[in-house]
Protein backbone atom coordinates (compact mmCIF):
# COMPACT_ATOMS: atom_id res chain seq x y z
CA UNK A 1 0.00 0.00 0.00
CA UNK A 2 0.97 3.63 -0.40
CA UNK A 3 1.66 4.96 3.11
CA UNK A 4 -0.69 7.61 4.47
CA UNK A 5 1.27 10.71 5.43
CA UNK A 6 0.46 12.89 8.45
CA UNK A 7 -2.49 15.09 7.57
CA UNK A 8 -4.44 12.15 6.17
CA UNK A 9 -7.71 11.03 7.74
CA UNK A 10 -7.94 7.77 9.71
CA UNK A 11 -11.31 6.22 10.53
CA UNK A 12 -12.25 4.53 13.80
CA UNK A 13 -15.23 2.31 14.58
CA UNK A 14 -16.01 2.61 18.27
CA UNK A 15 -16.01 5.57 20.62
CA UNK A 16 -14.80 4.20 23.96
CA UNK A 17 -11.65 4.88 25.93
CA UNK A 18 -9.47 2.73 23.67
CA UNK A 19 -10.62 4.84 20.75
CA UNK A 20 -9.95 8.01 22.71
CA UNK A 21 -6.34 6.99 23.31
CA UNK A 22 -6.00 5.95 19.66
CA UNK A 23 -7.24 9.39 18.58
CA UNK A 24 -4.73 11.16 20.79
CA UNK A 25 -1.85 8.99 19.58
CA UNK A 26 -2.78 9.39 15.90
CA UNK A 27 -3.25 13.14 16.28
CA UNK A 28 0.16 13.47 17.93
CA UNK A 29 1.60 12.01 14.71
CA UNK A 30 -0.29 14.59 12.68
CA UNK A 31 -3.21 12.46 11.47
CA UNK A 32 -6.84 13.49 11.63
CA UNK A 33 -9.37 11.02 13.00
CA UNK A 34 -13.05 10.47 12.27
CA UNK A 35 -14.96 8.34 14.79
CA UNK A 36 -18.15 6.39 14.09
CA UNK A 37 -20.09 5.41 17.21
CA UNK A 38 -23.80 5.22 18.11
CA UNK A 39 -23.34 7.26 21.29
CA UNK A 40 -23.35 11.03 21.35
CA UNK A 41 -20.39 12.62 23.18
CA UNK A 42 -18.45 9.35 23.36
CA UNK A 43 -14.95 9.42 24.92
CA UNK A 44 -13.34 9.08 21.48
CA UNK A 45 -15.84 11.26 19.67
CA UNK A 46 -15.20 14.14 22.05
CA UNK A 47 -11.52 14.35 21.04
CA UNK A 48 -11.83 13.26 17.38
CA UNK A 49 -11.50 15.69 14.50
CA UNK A 50 -14.90 14.51 13.30
CA UNK A 51 -17.59 12.48 15.06
CA UNK A 52 -20.22 10.48 13.18
CA UNK A 53 -23.05 9.49 15.51
CA UNK A 54 -24.77 6.52 13.89
CA UNK A 55 -25.21 2.77 14.06
CA UNK A 56 -22.21 0.76 12.91
CA UNK A 57 -24.25 -0.64 10.03
CA UNK A 58 -25.67 2.71 8.92
CA UNK A 59 -24.84 2.76 5.21
CA UNK A 60 -24.77 6.55 5.01
CA UNK A 61 -22.34 6.87 7.90
CA UNK A 62 -20.12 4.10 6.54
CA UNK A 63 -20.11 5.76 3.13
CA UNK A 64 -19.16 9.08 4.72
CA UNK A 65 -16.31 7.41 6.63
CA UNK A 66 -15.08 5.65 3.49
CA UNK A 67 -15.23 8.86 1.48
CA UNK A 68 -13.24 10.82 4.04
CA UNK A 69 -10.62 8.40 5.33
CA UNK A 70 -7.72 6.51 3.82
CA UNK A 71 -8.08 3.64 6.26
CA UNK A 72 -10.15 2.46 9.22
CA UNK A 73 -9.60 0.45 12.37
CA UNK A 74 -11.65 -0.66 15.39
CA UNK A 75 -11.41 -0.01 19.10
CA UNK A 76 -13.32 -3.08 20.26
CA UNK A 77 -14.03 -6.53 18.86
CA UNK A 78 -17.82 -6.42 18.79
CA UNK A 79 -18.11 -4.08 15.82
CA UNK A 80 -20.23 -5.96 13.25
CA UNK A 81 -17.93 -7.72 10.79
CA UNK A 82 -20.33 -6.63 8.03
CA UNK A 83 -19.29 -3.02 8.68
CA UNK A 84 -15.63 -3.94 8.24
CA UNK A 85 -16.41 -5.87 5.06
CA UNK A 86 -18.28 -2.86 3.65
CA UNK A 87 -15.39 -0.51 4.34
CA UNK A 88 -12.80 -2.96 3.02
CA UNK A 89 -14.32 -2.69 -0.46
CA UNK A 90 -12.96 0.82 -0.84
CA UNK A 91 -10.31 1.39 1.83
CA UNK A 92 -7.69 -0.22 4.00
CA UNK A 93 -9.13 -1.86 7.14
CA UNK A 94 -7.08 -3.20 10.05
CA UNK A 95 -7.71 -5.69 11.48
CA UNK A 96 -9.56 -7.58 8.78
CA UNK A 97 -13.12 -8.80 9.24
CA UNK A 98 -12.08 -12.46 9.29
CA UNK A 99 -9.72 -11.99 12.25
CA UNK A 100 -12.29 -9.96 14.17
CA UNK A 101 -15.02 -12.54 13.51
CA UNK A 102 -12.91 -15.26 15.13
CA UNK A 103 -12.30 -13.18 18.26
CA UNK A 104 -15.97 -12.12 18.47
CA UNK A 105 -17.11 -15.67 19.13
CA UNK A 106 -15.59 -17.66 21.98
CA UNK A 107 -16.36 -20.95 20.24
CA UNK A 108 -14.59 -19.89 17.06
CA UNK A 109 -11.74 -18.49 19.12
CA UNK A 110 -11.20 -21.63 21.22
CA UNK A 111 -11.53 -23.86 18.16
CA UNK A 112 -9.01 -21.77 16.23
CA UNK A 113 -6.50 -21.74 19.08
CA UNK A 114 -6.74 -25.48 19.72
CA UNK A 115 -6.89 -26.34 16.01
CA UNK A 116 -3.60 -24.57 15.37
CA UNK A 117 -1.84 -26.42 18.16
CA UNK A 118 -1.58 -23.61 20.69
CA UNK A 119 -1.92 -24.54 24.38
CA UNK A 120 -5.44 -24.10 25.71
CA UNK A 121 -7.29 -25.44 28.73
CA UNK A 122 -9.89 -28.24 28.44
CA UNK A 123 -13.26 -27.01 27.16
CA UNK A 124 -16.50 -28.13 25.57
CA UNK A 125 -19.06 -26.36 23.41
CA UNK A 126 -22.65 -26.16 24.67
CA UNK A 127 -25.23 -25.48 21.99
CA UNK A 128 -28.35 -27.09 23.48
CA UNK A 129 -29.88 -28.07 26.82
CA UNK A 130 -28.90 -31.66 26.05
CA UNK A 131 -25.26 -30.61 25.71
CA UNK A 132 -25.52 -29.03 29.15
CA UNK A 133 -27.11 -32.15 30.65
CA UNK A 134 -24.32 -34.31 29.21
CA UNK A 135 -21.49 -32.04 30.36
CA UNK A 136 -18.25 -33.94 30.87
CA UNK A 137 -17.60 -34.33 34.62
CA UNK A 138 -13.89 -33.95 33.85
CA UNK A 139 -14.60 -30.27 33.09
CA UNK A 140 -16.02 -29.65 36.58
CA UNK A 141 -15.63 -27.48 38.49
CA UNK A 142 -15.65 -25.06 35.61
CA UNK A 143 -16.97 -21.83 34.15
CA UNK A 144 -19.76 -21.46 31.60
CA UNK A 145 -18.99 -18.52 29.32
CA UNK A 146 -21.27 -16.98 26.72
CA UNK A 147 -19.95 -17.40 23.19
CA UNK A 148 -20.49 -13.73 22.37
CA UNK A 149 -20.38 -10.32 24.05
CA UNK A 150 -18.57 -11.41 27.20
CA UNK A 151 -15.98 -9.07 28.75
CA UNK A 152 -14.77 -7.84 32.15
CA UNK A 153 -16.27 -10.88 33.87
CA UNK A 154 -19.68 -10.50 32.21
CA UNK A 155 -21.35 -13.54 30.67
CA UNK A 156 -19.60 -16.00 33.00
CA UNK A 157 -21.03 -18.35 35.62
CA UNK A 158 -19.06 -20.75 37.82
CA UNK A 159 -20.39 -24.30 37.99
CA UNK A 160 -19.59 -27.35 40.11
CA UNK A 161 -22.15 -29.95 38.97
CA UNK A 162 -24.05 -30.89 35.82
CA UNK A 163 -27.13 -29.36 37.40
CA UNK A 164 -25.20 -26.11 37.75
CA UNK A 165 -24.26 -26.33 34.06
CA UNK A 166 -27.91 -26.77 33.07
CA UNK A 167 -28.95 -23.77 35.16
CA UNK A 168 -26.09 -21.65 33.84
CA UNK A 169 -26.92 -22.51 30.23
CA UNK A 170 -30.54 -21.49 30.84
CA UNK A 171 -29.40 -18.28 32.54
CA UNK A 172 -27.41 -17.46 29.39
CA UNK A 173 -30.65 -17.58 27.42
CA UNK A 174 -29.99 -21.11 26.12
CA UNK A 175 -27.56 -19.60 23.61
CA UNK A 176 -24.25 -21.11 22.58
CA UNK A 177 -21.70 -21.23 25.40
CA UNK A 178 -18.34 -22.70 26.26
CA UNK A 179 -17.72 -24.79 29.38
CA UNK A 180 -14.12 -24.40 30.53
CA UNK A 181 -12.52 -26.40 33.30
CA UNK A 182 -11.23 -24.22 36.13
CA UNK A 183 -7.47 -23.83 35.92
CA UNK A 184 -5.23 -23.93 38.99
CA UNK A 185 -3.90 -20.44 38.37
CA UNK A 186 -0.47 -19.27 39.37
CA UNK A 187 -0.68 -16.00 37.45
CA UNK A 188 -2.41 -14.30 34.56
CA UNK A 189 -0.22 -12.60 31.98
CA UNK A 190 -0.70 -11.00 28.59
CA UNK A 191 1.32 -10.01 25.56
CA UNK A 192 0.46 -7.20 23.15
CA UNK A 193 1.86 -7.65 19.64
CA UNK A 194 1.62 -5.76 16.37
CA UNK A 195 1.88 -7.15 12.84
CA UNK A 196 2.29 -5.43 9.48
CA UNK A 197 1.16 -6.41 6.00
CA UNK A 198 4.50 -8.03 5.19
CA UNK A 199 4.31 -10.25 8.26
CA UNK A 200 6.75 -8.22 10.34
CA UNK A 201 6.05 -8.57 14.05
CA UNK A 202 6.91 -6.71 17.25
CA UNK A 203 5.90 -7.47 20.83
CA UNK A 204 5.90 -5.49 24.05
CA UNK A 205 7.13 -6.99 27.34
CA UNK A 206 4.92 -9.54 29.08
CA UNK A 207 2.50 -7.97 31.55
CA UNK A 208 1.31 -9.55 34.79
CA UNK A 209 -2.38 -8.92 35.46
CA UNK A 210 -4.31 -8.90 38.74
CA UNK A 211 -8.11 -8.96 38.62
CA UNK A 212 -10.86 -8.07 41.06
CA UNK A 213 -14.45 -9.22 40.48
CA UNK A 214 -13.57 -10.28 36.95
CA UNK A 215 -12.24 -6.82 35.99
CA UNK A 216 -8.58 -5.95 35.52
CA UNK A 217 -7.36 -4.14 38.63
CA UNK A 218 -3.59 -3.85 38.21
CA UNK A 219 -1.04 -4.57 35.47
CA UNK A 220 2.64 -4.99 36.29
CA UNK A 221 5.22 -4.54 33.54
CA UNK A 222 7.47 -6.32 33.12
CA UNK A 223 5.75 -9.37 34.59
CA UNK A 224 7.39 -11.08 37.55
CA UNK A 225 8.00 -14.33 35.70
CA UNK A 226 11.02 -16.32 34.55
CA UNK A 227 12.73 -15.10 31.39
CA UNK A 228 12.00 -18.39 29.65
CA UNK A 229 8.28 -18.16 30.33
CA UNK A 230 8.20 -14.55 29.13
CA UNK A 231 9.93 -15.48 25.89
CA UNK A 232 7.55 -18.42 25.38
CA UNK A 233 4.52 -16.16 25.88
CA UNK A 234 5.85 -13.63 23.38
CA UNK A 235 6.57 -16.40 20.86
CA UNK A 236 3.07 -17.87 21.18
CA UNK A 237 1.45 -14.45 20.84
CA UNK A 238 3.40 -13.65 17.70
CA UNK A 239 2.70 -17.11 16.23
CA UNK A 240 -1.02 -16.62 16.88
CA UNK A 241 -0.96 -13.27 15.08
CA UNK A 242 0.72 -14.97 12.13
CA UNK A 243 -1.78 -17.84 12.11
CA UNK A 244 -4.60 -15.28 12.01
CA UNK A 245 -2.82 -13.41 9.19
CA UNK A 246 -3.44 -10.44 11.45
CA UNK A 247 -2.90 -6.76 10.65
CA UNK A 248 -2.76 -4.33 13.54
CA UNK A 249 -2.45 -4.57 17.32
CA UNK A 250 -3.48 -7.76 19.10
CA UNK A 251 -3.43 -8.90 22.73
CA UNK A 252 -3.14 -12.53 23.83
CA UNK A 253 -4.11 -13.32 27.42
CA UNK A 254 -2.63 -16.35 29.18
CA UNK A 255 -3.19 -18.41 32.29
CA UNK A 256 -0.01 -19.59 34.01
CA UNK A 257 -0.70 -23.06 35.42
CA UNK A 258 1.48 -25.12 37.80
CA UNK A 259 4.93 -25.82 36.41
CA UNK A 260 4.82 -22.52 34.52
CA UNK A 261 2.60 -24.07 31.86
CA UNK A 262 1.09 -21.41 29.61
CA UNK A 263 -2.53 -21.71 28.45
CA UNK A 264 -4.07 -19.24 26.02
CA UNK A 265 -7.17 -17.74 27.62
CA UNK A 266 -8.42 -15.39 24.93
CA UNK A 267 -7.50 -13.05 22.10
CA UNK A 268 -8.39 -9.36 21.87
CA UNK A 269 -8.09 -8.00 18.29
CA UNK A 270 -7.23 -4.47 19.45
CA UNK A 271 -5.14 -2.59 21.99
CA UNK A 272 -5.75 -3.91 25.48
CA UNK A 273 -6.24 -2.56 29.00
CA UNK A 274 -3.10 -4.39 30.12
CA UNK A 275 -1.13 -2.45 27.50
CA UNK A 276 -2.05 1.03 28.70
CA UNK A 277 1.26 1.32 30.51
CA UNK A 278 2.96 1.52 27.09
CA UNK A 279 1.77 5.13 26.76
CA UNK A 280 4.13 6.26 29.51
CA UNK A 281 6.74 3.50 29.79
CA UNK A 282 7.62 2.49 26.21
CA UNK A 283 9.19 4.15 23.20
CA UNK A 284 6.04 3.42 21.17
CA UNK A 285 2.62 2.91 22.75
CA UNK A 286 0.15 0.30 21.59
CA UNK A 287 -2.08 3.10 20.31
CA UNK A 288 0.62 4.82 18.29
CA UNK A 289 1.49 1.42 16.82
CA UNK A 290 -2.15 0.90 15.85
CA UNK A 291 -2.05 4.19 13.96
CA UNK A 292 1.29 3.36 12.34
CA UNK A 293 0.11 -0.01 11.03
CA UNK A 294 -3.14 1.48 9.75
CA UNK A 295 -1.26 4.26 7.97
CA UNK A 296 1.22 1.79 6.50
CA UNK A 297 4.29 3.47 7.98
CA UNK A 298 7.09 1.54 9.76
CA UNK A 299 6.33 0.29 13.25
CA UNK A 300 7.98 1.97 16.22
CA UNK A 301 10.27 0.44 18.81
CA UNK A 302 8.45 -1.38 21.64
CA UNK A 303 11.33 -1.05 24.13
CA UNK A 304 10.18 -0.45 27.71
CA UNK A 305 12.40 2.24 29.20
CA UNK A 306 10.81 2.37 32.67
CA UNK A 307 9.23 -0.24 34.97
CA UNK A 308 5.51 0.46 35.33
CA UNK A 309 2.43 -0.49 37.31
CA UNK A 310 -0.98 0.46 35.93
CA UNK A 311 -4.02 0.72 38.20
CA UNK A 312 -7.54 0.88 36.78
CA UNK A 313 -9.87 3.57 38.12
CA UNK A 314 -13.43 2.26 38.26
CA UNK A 315 -16.65 4.15 38.83
CA UNK A 316 -16.80 2.66 42.34
CA UNK A 317 -14.40 5.41 43.42
CA UNK A 318 -17.18 7.96 42.94
CA UNK A 319 -19.49 6.10 45.36
CA UNK A 320 -17.28 5.37 48.36
CA UNK A 321 -19.81 6.86 50.78
CA UNK A 322 -22.20 4.00 49.93
CA UNK A 323 -24.71 6.50 48.59
CA UNK A 324 -26.14 7.00 45.12
CA UNK A 325 -24.74 10.51 44.63
CA UNK A 326 -21.30 10.44 42.97
CA UNK A 327 -18.42 12.44 44.42
CA UNK A 328 -15.28 13.26 42.44
CA UNK A 329 -12.27 11.30 43.76
CA UNK A 330 -9.26 13.10 45.23
CA UNK A 331 -7.28 13.45 42.01
CA UNK A 332 -4.98 16.07 43.52
CA UNK A 333 -3.53 13.32 45.68
CA UNK A 334 -2.60 11.40 42.54
CA UNK A 335 -1.10 14.48 40.89
CA UNK A 336 1.05 15.04 43.98
CA UNK A 337 3.07 11.95 43.03
CA UNK A 338 5.77 12.96 40.52
CA UNK A 339 6.07 9.45 39.08
CA UNK A 340 2.34 8.87 38.55
CA UNK A 341 0.59 9.55 35.24
CA UNK A 342 -3.18 10.09 35.50
CA UNK A 343 -5.41 9.29 32.52
CA UNK A 344 -9.15 10.05 32.76
CA UNK A 345 -11.42 9.00 29.91
CA UNK A 346 -13.92 11.84 29.82
CA UNK A 347 -16.92 9.66 30.65
CA UNK A 348 -19.76 11.80 31.93
CA UNK A 349 -21.52 9.19 34.06
CA UNK A 350 -19.60 7.18 36.67
CA UNK A 351 -21.04 3.74 37.37
CA UNK A 352 -19.82 0.97 39.65
CA UNK A 353 -17.61 -1.37 37.67
CA UNK A 354 -17.22 1.09 34.78
CA UNK A 355 -13.68 1.92 33.68
CA UNK A 356 -13.32 5.67 34.13
CA UNK A 357 -9.56 6.02 33.83
CA UNK A 358 -6.22 4.62 34.90
CA UNK A 359 -3.04 5.74 36.59
CA UNK A 360 0.38 4.48 35.56
CA UNK A 361 3.06 4.50 38.24
CA UNK A 362 6.65 4.63 37.03
CA UNK A 363 9.84 3.93 38.94
CA UNK A 364 13.56 3.42 38.65
CA UNK A 365 12.80 -0.15 39.76
CA UNK A 366 9.69 -2.28 39.66
CA UNK A 367 9.58 -2.27 43.47
CA UNK A 368 9.51 1.54 43.42
CA UNK A 369 6.65 1.56 40.92
CA UNK A 370 4.76 -1.00 43.01
CA UNK A 371 5.24 1.12 46.12
CA UNK A 372 3.85 4.23 44.41
CA UNK A 373 0.88 2.23 43.13
CA UNK A 374 0.18 0.87 46.62
CA UNK A 375 0.28 4.38 48.09
CA UNK A 376 -2.08 5.79 45.46
CA UNK A 377 -4.52 2.90 45.88
CA UNK A 378 -4.56 3.49 49.62
CA UNK A 379 -5.08 7.25 49.22
CA UNK A 380 -7.94 6.77 46.75
CA UNK A 381 -9.55 3.98 48.77
CA UNK A 382 -8.93 1.22 46.22
CA UNK A 383 -8.65 -2.20 47.93
CA UNK A 384 -5.08 -3.50 48.07
Region annotations inferred by a language model:
Residues 102-190, 194-240, 373:
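Active-site nucleotide/adenylate-binding loops and adjacent lid/helix of ATP-dependent enzymes
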Residues 1-111, 115, 130, 371:
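ATP-binding N-terminal substructure of ATP-dependent carboxylate-amine bond-forming enzymes
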Residues 202, 250, 262-266:
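Protein kinase-like catalytic core scaffold
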